[in-house]
Amino acid sequence: MAEIRRPARLRTLLAAASVLLVAACVPVQPVEPAPPRADVTGVEIGARTPRQGGDLVMALSAEPDRLDPTTSSSLYTRYVMNAVCEKLYDIDAKGTIVPQLASALPTVSADGLTVTIPVRTGPRFADGTPLDAAAVVTTLQRNLTLEGSARKGELGPVADVRTSDAEHVVVRYKTPFAPLAAALADRAGMVMSPKALAEEGADFGDHPVCVGPFSFVERVPQTSITVKRDPLYYAADEVHLDTITYRIMTDANIRAANLRSGDVQVADSLSPQDVDALAKEKGVGLLQTGSFGYQGITFNVGNTDGTGKPPGVIDTPIARDPRVREAFALSIDRAALVNSVFNNWYETACSFIAPGSTYSSPASEACPPHDPARAKQLLAEAGVPVPYRITLSTSNNADSLRLAQAIQASVVDGGFEVAIQPVEYSTLLDVQKRGDFEVLQLGWSGRVDPHGNASSFLSTGGANNYSGYSNPEVDTLLKQAAQAEDVATRAELYGKVTEIVQRDNPIQYLYRVRSITGYTDDVAGVATYDDGVVRLSRAAFL
C-alpha cells in the first residue's frame, strides 16, 4: 500500500484556492411530495414535412472532455459522440437494447463463455473505409489494452477477441459476463475507424472518425464543437440538418434565455428553477425523462495515486473511519434537501439502481434515515472534534453550488462544518480521477445495466473508482452479479452490494435527476432517454 498521506494536489488546492465557508443560506425545508410526471422522451416529426438543411445550435451545459470513446468519462461527450460515432447497440425510449451497427443481438454459447456479435455490412466510416468485423475487433482491442482506458472494466473478463469472418466478431470470456450487450450500447460499443486510429494514435480524440450521421468538423475549446452531415452515412436520407453546433453555455439562466430568444434551438439540463416558467411560454417545448444514474457524494478513502492504481491510506478521520462517513449520511435529509433545491423536480436516491430497473430490490431502494442525533453519537465514538470540518469540491454552476450550500446547511445539526470548493466542471473530472479531493459532489448519467453503474466505481482498481475504495466482499459480489444470467439472482446480489456500500459509505447516493431538455417549436426529431443523452441525429427544422 502507499504511504500514509493526504493527496498532494488537495493540499495545493486548499492552500492556493479560495474555499467557500458559506453561511447556511439555503433553507432545507420539507415540501409537498413531488407530483407524478409523465416522461416525454421526444418530439416526433410525424406527418409534418421536415426542412432539409440548416444549422441547429444546441446549448450544452458543460464542456465535453476528450472526444475519444476509449478514455472519455463525461456525459456531454456522449451528446456529441452520439451524432458522430454509432455503437454496436443502442437503447430505445423504453430502455430496451436494440442493434445499431450490429445486425442482431449477440448469441451466447451454452457455457456463457463465447459471445458472437453479427456486424452490419455496408456502412462506411467518415473517411470512406468500410465497417467490418475486423474494424470492430480493432476498437475492442483498443478499449481493452490502451493505457488509461475507461472501457476495459465495462467489457468484463475477456480472454480474447477475434473475427470468425468479415461479418462476425467472437468474444471469448474467462468467466461468463452477462452485461456485454449493455456495455456495447454505450461508449465501449462506439466503433472507431482503424485507419484514423493508425494515423492519429493517442490524438484520435482531436479528430474522431467513426460511422455516424454526422462527422467531426472542429472544436473551439470552451466555446463550441461543430459536426456536419456525413454523405457516406448508410442512412443519409434520414438525416436532415447540414450541421450541429454544440455551444458551451454553463449558466442555466443563459441557456434558458437563448432558448427563449431562439438563438439556440435545443438546450440541455434546464434548471428546475426555470422549468415551470418555461413550460408556460409559447414557442418552447420541454422533454423530460427519468435517469438510470445518480448524483451523489464521493469520499476519498484511498485514491492517493489516481484511479486504476492500488489504493493508498489517507490519514484523516473521514477517510479511515466509516463511522464518520456514516455520520455524514445520517446528517442529510434527502427529501427536504432535494425538494428545496430542485423545486420538487428530482427524486431521492440511495443506491446505484433506479427504482424502475428490473434489477431493483427492497435492499437497493432502502435509504439511511435522517438522524443527526445519531450522527453526533458516531462522531463522539470516533473521537473526532465537533464540528468536524471537511471540504466539499463541486462544480461551479449555479445548481451545483445551490446543492452544496444546502448540504452545508443540512449537516450542521449532525456535527459537520462544510467548506465548499467550487471547480470548473472539466477540471473537476480531472480532480476526481487524480484523487485531489477530500469529499466531492458529482454524478453518473447511468446505464441500463447496473454493472455499468457499480462495477467500475466500486471494484478495487476500477477505472471510475474515484474514492479508492476496496472491499473484497464487494468485488466478489459484483463479479458474481456479472456472471449470473437470471435477473432475480443479479438483483439480489446488487442488493447485497448496496447494503455493504451503505455501511462503508465510499459513495453516498443523494438523488436522481429528471433530464429536462428544452427545444424551440420550429424543430422536431429531438429525443432524450433515461441514459441521459440528448439525441439530435434525426432532428430537423420544420
Tell where the protein language model's regions lie, with residue ranges.
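Alpha-helical secondary-structure segments
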Residues: V57, L131-T139, A166-R172, G212-P213, ...
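Surface-exposed binding/hinge segments that line
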Residues: P118, K152-A196
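Gly/Pro-rich hinge or "lid" segments in bacterial periplasmic/extracellular proteins
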Residues: A185-V239, T243, Q377
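Ligand/substrate-recognition segments at binding pockets and active sites
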Residues: Y346-E347, T358, A380-G446, V487
